[in-house]
Amino acid sequence: MTSTSTPAVVIAGPTASGKSGLAVRIAREFGGVVINADSMQVTDALPLLTARPAPGDMALAPHRLYAVLPPTELCSAARWRDMAAMEMAAAWQAGMLPILTGGTGLYLKAVMEGLSPIPEIPESIRAEARTLLAEMGNAAFHNRLAKHDPLMAERLDSGNSQRLARAWEVVTATGRSLAEWQDEPREGAVEARWFSLVLDPERPRLYAQCESRFRAMVTAGALDEVRDFEALRLPPDLPIQKALGRRELAAHLAGETDLDTAIAAACQATRNYAKRQGTWFRHQMMASLTASEQLSESLIATIFLKIRQHLLTAP
């Protein structure tokens, strides 16, 4: 049985900030289970581009919820929250510490704070939203949304396909604006004594890490990975299609650009995404500890000390 006396650790932060490696260190120090909180790494596609931990790293500590769904299956925050709750309960039952790590902020908020009680949207309506968006284009779809849900249309940028579709699905299925649902009290949070660590590297260092990691992915075979993925001809609106670097490397493979240009564009896209993630975590997540400096042995020792104090402190 879970309660607020049961401890759990969250490691959040932007891409390339060092979350996965730190999670393994914490798991080995405290007898933990690493639970994936990254929406791309849930799928069993594009392991290099999604920065899924390598098999050697995963062998160092138990890892859960990595590559557990095909890329054609959607993993909403509610679905992930339910899967994570089961893994956390199993960890506690085994006397182990759940360590949730990833950059999908909505996943982490879902498990820590709960979700607005939006009813399950029928797949037929979800499919209709995707079809309409593909046929109409973002701008026209945004205008159509404004007629049915002006509140969300005002909040959303026309370039955000996924959120536009979500807003349309909700108002179509429920007759209420997504904004109204989001104002409802949240439900379904996992009761735990949370220790949340946010990695927030200084931007020059984070951007350098983004670039060096992507170039390492290319060296390790990301082009072949994308070639094989493109051969599957999956629907273009699947979330996995937004894996950082996929579009740019696919353009190179199609002869639309040279490799250096593709890599530069992918690195820029990764930096942009990391910047957005960092901003989101700074404003949306209440952190027990924020670490901005380089992940040195000294800093890791400090993190271990803070976690140990948290584990020993009764609620």
UniProtKB/Swiss-Prot annotation:
What's this protein's name? Answer: tRNA dimethylallyltransferase
> Which Gene Ontology BP annotations are present?
tRNA modification
Record field: catalytic activity: adenosine(37) in tRNA + dimethylallyl diphosphate = N(6)-dimethylallyladenosine(37) in tRNA + diphosphate
Function of this protein?
Answer: Catalyzes the transfer of a dimethylallyl group onto the adenine at position 37 in tRNAs that read codons beginning with uridine, leading to the formation of N6-(dimethylallyl)adenosine (i(6)A).
Concerning InterPro entries, the annotation shows: Dimethylallyltransferase (IPR039657), IPT (IPR018022), P-loop_NTPase (IPR027417)
Q: Where does ATP bind?
A: 13-20
Keyword terms: ATP-binding, Magnesium, Nucleotide-binding, Transferase, tRNA processing
Tell me the subunit arrangement.
Monomer.
Any one Gene Ontology MF annotation carried by this entry is: tRNA dimethylallyltransferase activity
NCBIfam families, A to Z: miaA (TIGR00174)
Q: Which domain of life is it from?
A: Bacteria
Stretch list, region Interaction with substrate tRNA = 38-41, 162-166
Q: Which PANTHER family match?
A: TRNA DIMETHYLALLYLTRANSFERASE
Query: Is Nucleotide-binding included in the keywords of this UniProt record?
Result: yes
Name the positions where substrate binds.
15-20
Q: Does the keyword ATP-binding apply?
A: yes
Where along the sequence does the record put site: Interaction with substrate tRNA? 104, 126
Homology family = Belongs to the IPP transferase family.
Task: Enumerate the cofactors the protein uses.
Answer: Mg(2+)
Native source species:
Paramagnetospirillum magneticum (strain ATCC 700264 / AMB-1) (Magnetospirillum magneticum)
Q: What is its EC number?
A: 2.5.1.75
HAMAP family registered for this protein in UniProt: IPP_trans
Q: What gene name is listed for this protein?
A: miaA
